[in-house]
UniProtKB/Swiss-Prot annotation:
Entry keyword set: Ribonucleoprotein, Ribosomal protein, RNA-binding, rRNA-binding
Complex formation: Part of the 30S ribosomal subunit.
Classification via PANTHER family: 40S RIBOSOMAL PROTEIN S11 FAMILY MEMBER, SMALL RIBOSOMAL SUBUNIT PROTEIN US17M
Source organism: Xanthobacter autotrophicus (strain ATCC BAA-1158 / Py2)
Known role: One of the primary rRNA binding proteins, it binds specifically to the 5'-end of 16S ribosomal RNA.
GO biological process: translation
GO CC field: cytosolic small ribosomal subunit
Disulphide bridges, residue numbers: none
SUPFAM superfamilies xref list: Nucleic acid-binding proteins
Family, as annotated: Belongs to the universal ribosomal protein uS17 family.
Name the record gives this protein: Small ribosomal subunit protein uS17
CDD domains from the UniProt entry: Ribosomal_uS17
Lineage: Bacteria, Pseudomonadati, Pseudomonadota, Alphaproteobacteria, Hyphomicrobiales
Molecular-function annotations in GO: rRNA binding; structural constituent of ribosome
Length: 82
């Protein structure tokens, strides 16, 4: 079975070797027929502490690393500096 891969934005990088990634999904409400946005936060392993707040990253399912971490960062894009 293939591992799930999700795209999200880093919202916290305060802990060592860990980033918190907010993944947003969109769906059509069954009754209102309106597009609804929902988000969920995932704790992901970042071995090199390379990703900072605002970066877009892709995370992949992994074996449990700790109580909260079941995902690892596989790639990403740095946020454009303004």
């Amino acid at each position: 079975m293939p591992k799930r891969v999700l795209q999200g934005v880093v919202v916290s990088d305060k802990t060592d070797k860990t980033v918190v990634v907010r993944v947003e999904r969109r769906f059509t409400h069954p009754l209102l027929k309106k597009t609804v946005r929902r988000s969920k936060k995932y704790h992901a392993h970042d071995e090199a502490n390379a990703w900072k707040v605002g970066d877009t990253v892709w995370i992949e399912e992994h074996r449990p690393i700790s109580k909260l971490k079941n995902w690892i960062v596989i790639q990403g894009e740095k946020r454009a500096e303004v």
